[in-house]
Amino acid sequence: MASTALSSAFSLLSLPSSSSPAAAAAAAPRSFAVPSRARPRRAVAVVASTATESPKVLELGDAIAGLTLEEARGLVDHLQERLGVSAAAFAPAAVVAAPGAGGAGAAADEAPAEKTEFDVVIEEVPSSARIASIKVVRALTNLALKEAKDLIEGLPKKVKEGVSKDEAEDAKKQLEEVGAKVSIA
């Protein structure tokens, strides 16, 4: 494909310079072959090589690749202990995504986790307390007037999500002071 284009280019360049323009036009090929892309491109595997690839590194890599899963887990545990690092520090999403992956033994060792994130839900607002409740909701959430009004009208709704216990209790206290019925979930 590329050779066809190159040979055409070289044949055009190799025309005799002493000939007249009419002779050059007569000697020039009448058609120019454009390589087609009818054949699919082939993927080429590129092997990454580093300048510091040593036989020791290759031997260690082959030894690690030959480990069973149980041996690999033991190696990881040993390296974590020896180097003082934790896999959870590098992959916090993986730890959260698979909380029961430790097996029955790990579940028995764990203490029940205390809830750290709470939602503040407005259950009911009396009609006499709507305006005051809208003001408090706007102060707590930085919502515009229309959004705060819509939130108060379609109850029950979450006012704050994923907040600390202190912040949830403070929001509940402020809303109850103006007459709203609030729960923390």
Curated annotation (Swiss-Prot):
GO terms for biological process: translation. Keywords: Chloroplast, Plastid, Ribonucleoprotein, Ribosomal protein, Transit peptide. Residues 1-47 form a transit peptide. It is found in: Plastid, Chloroplast. GO terms for cellular component: chloroplast; ribonucleoprotein complex; ribosome. One of its GO terms (molecular function) is structural constituent of ribosome. Gene3D superfamilies: 3.30.1390.10, Single helix bin. Coiled coil: none annotated. Belongs to the bacterial ribosomal protein bL12 family. NCBIfam families: L12. This is Large ribosomal subunit protein bL12c. It comes from Oryza sativa subsp. japonica (Rice). The gene is RPL12-2.
